Amino acid sequence: MVDRLLAFDPGGRGIAHFFVPGGAARAALALRHAKRVLLTTGFSIGPGLPETDGPPGTASLGRALRALGAEVMYITDAASLPPLQAALEVLGEPTRILTFHADGDAALTARRLLAEHAPTHLVSIERPGRARGGDYLSMRGESVGEWNAALDELFLQAPRRMVTVGVGDGGNEIGMGVLRARLARAGARVSKVASIVPARHVVVAGVSNWGAYGIVVELARLSKRPLLHTAEDERRMVRACVGAGAVDGITRKREATVDALPLEAHAGMVELLRLVQDSTPHGGKTR
């Protein structure tokens, strides 16, 4: 049932060409007993224009992992830090956020951060991954490299033993590199922007936030604990992200929408996912 919800493609992006059945379930299995998780998010489509997609999903998944005993850290760039912090604050989560600076040697910075914080798992939710030509591209095929730090270097520099998870909805995000053959068949537009940065586990959804929520539901089913946030939390997170400077990644408007879908569409998706979660016997319901 989680797959059916994540495969819903209201934006008509054609994710059926590269949807990965069971992706959320496999990611949850890999994350269930994680010790130290470093999560990244943030996709800026212009100067000072971070998206509303990504931070809510990251905050929700981070909260779930922390509830299961993991040490959770976050990393993003300066532009996307305020929306991520805002989403975490809505859920009452600690805001331990590292900032990845765009200047200098990104590969060296990534190796230093990995050595210093020693995560066992790396998770990216709606974060741009470089395309074949080395640039970072929006779904419109426009370069966004100037406004997004090279956080994909964390995945490129990660040792093989480290578990990596990538969540995306357009093919141009970190992790989608393992789907290059499928993305090539999805059409010229998707093929052009497709990321070459791989992850061991990939989750594709109609909206990246939903992909993260799908992992949370699968974690809830595995642990028999209610972990997903509420529809009201969803509304508050998106509004808080906008208040912190985020915009809709498609309309580019500073309003409480995500990927051109109204707030109630996202609240409704959370309600549906909570129904799936609550169909598994556990000790109670999330607040």
Segment roles from a protein language model:
Residues 1-36:
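Positively charged, low-complexity intrinsically disordered leader regions
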Residues 43-45, 127-130, 170-171:
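Short glycine-rich anion-binding loops that position phosphate/pyrophosphate groups of nucleotides
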Residues 51-71:
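Histidine-anchored nucleotide/phosphate-binding helix
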Residues 69-70, 158-164, 172:
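A short helix->loop->beta-strand "cap" motif at the edges of active sites that frequently abuts
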Residues 70-79:
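Short internal beta-strands
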Residues 82-87, 165-168, 172-184:
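Glycine-rich, charge-decorated loop segments at or immediately adjacent to ligand/cofactor-binding or catalytic sites
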